[in-house]
Amino acid sequence: MKLLNVINFVFLMFVSSSSFAQVIEMNNSPLRDFVTWYSKQSGESVIVSPDVKGTVTVYSSDVKPENLRNFFISVLRANNFDMVGSIPSIIQKYNPNNQDYIDELPSSDNQEYDDNSAPSGGFFVPQNDNVTQTFKINNVRAKDLIRVVELFVKSNTSKSSNVLSIDGSNLLVVSAPKDILDNLPQFLSTVDLPTDQILIEGLIFEVQQGDALDFSFAAGSQRGTVAGGVNTDRLTSVLSSAGGSFGIFNGDVLGLSVRALKTNSHSKILSVPRILTLSGQKGSISVGQNVPFITGRVTGESANVNNPFQTIERQNVGISMSVFPVAMAGGNIVLDITSKADSLSSSTQASDVITNQRSIATTVNLRDGQTLLLGGLTDYKNTSQDSGVPFLSKIPLIGLLFSSRSDSNEESTLYVLVKATIVRAL
C-alpha cells in the first residue's frame, strides 16, 4: 500500500511539473512548426496566413502555461508577425496600422540600445532567473560580436548565459541575468562602430635584367624613401640600383607607372589587381590555370591489378595576391600582403609538370595613400634551339654543315607595387 502511494505521488509530481512548464528548443526551424507546437500545447486553434514564411530560433526551458500565449506572441513579433482576432486567431505579417491586433504584451523596463534596440524584437523568457532579449546591431555583423559579448557577460556573472545571432535581421539574442542586460547596451555602443574599408591597388610586373625603365615622367616629382633611409627622387633609380627593390612613395606613382611600363618593350605587366575589403578582413584575387599534378600511380605490373590507375591533385598556377589590412586611428595601415607569380616550366627533363614559383610575403606599415615597392625576385631561363636544312641536316658527319644550335640566357626580375587607400565609413 505504501509503495502504491509513493508511485501515485511521483506520478502526480510529474504531471504537475509538466503542466506548469513547457520546454522548447528550435534552431532555424520553420515558423509553421513553431505554430503547430503552440497549438498543441495551448489547445488553441490558429490559422496561418499563406504569406507567413520564415524560420525561428528559440531556446527556453521554463514556459509556464499562463505565460505561453505571451511568449508565443513575443516570438512572432520578434520575426515581424502577429496574431489577429481570437477563436481562431490568425497569424499574419505585422501591420502597425491594423486595429485588430490582440492586446499589447505587458510592458517591460528593458533598457534600449540607441533608438533601434530590442523593442522591435525583444522578448522575455524565464529561465533560471535569466532574461532573454534581442539587440539590434547597426554597424557590424552580429555574429562577429558573439565572442566579445560572451566575454562581457561571463566576466560580470558566474551564472549560466547564452549568446546567439540572427543573421537575417542582424540581431544578437542574449540570455543572461537582467542586471547584465541593463549594462549591455552601453558596452555594445563601444564595439558596434562603423568599419573603414581599404582599397588595395596593385601592379605586378617583370623587367628583363639590364634594361633601364624610364619612370621619370611617372614618378620624377614623387619623393620616396628606400629601405635603409636612402631618399630618392625617382622610381627609376630604385629599380636600376643594385639591390634597390624596396621603397615607399607618396603620390600617384601606381597609375603613372602603368603608362611607363606599357611604352617599354622589355617590360611585361603580369597583373593589375584591385581589392576592396573591410579593415580586419582578408581579401584575395587570382588568375591562372588549375593544373593537375600526378600524386600516385598504380600499374598492372607493379600491383597485379586489372585496372591500372593514377591519382592527381589539382593546384592553381598563375598570378595571385592576398591582403589583410587593418586601418589604424592615426591614418596608418598595417598590411599583410602575399603575392605570387607562378608559371609552368617548358623543361622536359622531368616526367611530370614543373612549375616556376616566385612569391613575396610581408607585413608593412603604410600611411594612407602611400605606394609600396617590393621586388628583387629574379628568374633565370636557359633555352636551346636547334635548326637546320631539312633532310640534309640529318646526314651523318656532313649534316653538321647544314645545322646550327643557339643557346640563350634570359634574366627577368619581378616587382610589385602596392597602394593602400582608406575609404572612410559614412
From Swiss-Prot:
It holds the Pfam family type_II_gspD_N0. It is found in: Host membrane. The keyword Nucleotidyltransferase does not apply. The chain crosses the membrane at residues 317-337. Keywords: Host membrane, Membrane, Signal, Transmembrane, Transmembrane helix, Viral extrusion, Viral release from host cell. It is a single-pass type I membrane protein. Residues 1-21 form the signal peptide. InterPro entries: Bact_Secretion_Sys_Channel (IPR050810), GspD-like_N0 (IPR049371), GspD/PilQ (IPR001775), NolW-like (IPR005644), NolW-like_sf (IPR038591), T2SS/T3SS_dom (IPR004846), T2SS_GspD_CS (IPR004845). One of its GO terms (biological process) is protein secretion. Belongs to the inovirus G4P protein family. Homomultimer. The channel is composed of 14 G4P subunits that confer a barrel-like structure. Interacts with G1P; this interaction results in a complex that spans the inner an outer host membranes. Acts in the assembly and extrusion of the bacteriophage by forming a channel across the host outer membrane. This channel is just large enough to allow a newly synthesized phage particle to pass through. Extrusion is a process of concomitant assembly and secretion and takes place at specific assembly sites where host inner and outer membranes are in close contacts. This is Virion export protein. The gene is IV.
